[in-house]
Amino acid sequence: MQHLDEIIANATAEIEQAGSLVALDEVRVQYLGKKGHLTLQLQGLGKLDPSERREAGQLINKGKQAVQAMLTERKDALQTAELEAKLAAETIDVSLPGRRIENGGLHPVTRTVERIEQFFGELGFSTESGPEIEDAFHNFDALNIAEDHPARTDHDTFFFNPDLMLRTHTSGVQIRTMENGKPPFRFIAPGRVYRNDYDQTHTPMFHQVEGMLVDENVNFAQLKGILHDFLCNFFEEEVEVRFRPSFFPFTEPSAEVDVKRKDGKWLEVLGCGMVHPNVLRSVGIDPEKYSGFAFGMGVERLTMLRYGVNDLRAFFENDLRFLKQFK
């Protein structure tokens, strides 16, 4: 039987030399495992004289406890060193400049829609919405648009079938709102609309805001006053406005609204008019009792004028160099 003091001395040296938890566990197995040196010492007690067996057993157990205590102490030291090394590697140098956080910004078209909603909201107009896939009644028939009107052809409209299409304007929202309520009405309807056109000033999808007011004794002078105030508010300056006679199937009389630019030229910004009696009749409103006005504007066109953008398509190209200018 190997001398116990020698075994303890060797175990002590190997425990102190263990540089990792893995190496330390190997030492534990070597001395305390099923076939470890101290385990074999205990198994060899049966070969001793009974008079020596008790004392030898006590010495071996005492040595075993000493080795176990050294293993535990060394394990704690290695774990502490490992944690300190990990923390040191993850230390943040607070003197280094931080990562720059990019601030986002609203899209210019969104800014314009919100500006329009805010102005008309202060005048008591609610904001309504409706489906972008519309049927012929709400997109054409109820708006007094004749069967042979060019807008009903696939040159101008994206049809799914003869009765379903991508809406060409948000006027359908006006019809649905009036169908589901009773006058008086005062609301705007912003949203995406679709037309089969694509060039520098047109895209197949664009945004529109239409508005409507229906009540007793509504007149064109009220419409002119509201739109003049809106345009001055939108461009944040007093602008010269003119109303030109025009034709829209859903309004009578109808007008196009121009603003005078700084270079003296007139530029069309929206269309408007008094709601046609046939439109009121289509939703069960008596045109002898009620009258109303309606207006519609292209959001991208107003945005182009406000920010001096020349190509409408730039709003939809997702070029950050362009969009960052509007933060």
From Swiss-Prot:
What is this enzyme's catalytic activity, as reactions? tRNA(Phe) + L-phenylalanine + ATP = L-phenylalanyl-tRNA(Phe) + AMP + diphosphate + H(+)
Q: Which UniProt keywords apply?
A: Aminoacyl-tRNA synthetase, ATP-binding, Cytoplasm, Ligase, Magnesium, Metal-binding, Nucleotide-binding, Protein biosynthesis
Per its record, what are the GO molecular function terms?
ATP binding; magnesium ion binding; phenylalanine-tRNA ligase activity; tRNA binding
Places the protein is found: Cytoplasm
Q: Got a GO cellular component term for this one?
A: cytoplasm
Q: Kindly list the positions annotated as binding Mg(2+).
A: 252
Pfam families, sorted: Phe_tRNA-synt_N, tRNA-synt_2d
Task: Name any cofactors this protein relies on.
Answer: Mg(2+)
Question: What detail does the entry give on cofactor binding?
Answer: Binds 2 magnesium ions per tetramer.
Q: How does it assemble?
A: Tetramer of two alpha and two beta subunits.
The record ties this protein, via PANTHER family, to:
PHENYLALANINE--TRNA LIGASE, MITOCHONDRIAL, PHENYLALANYL-TRNA SYNTHETASE
| Protein name as annotated | Phenylalanine--tRNA ligase alpha subunit
Q: From which lineage does this chain's organism come? A: Bacteria, Pseudomonadati, Pseudomonadota, Gammaproteobacteria, Vibrionales
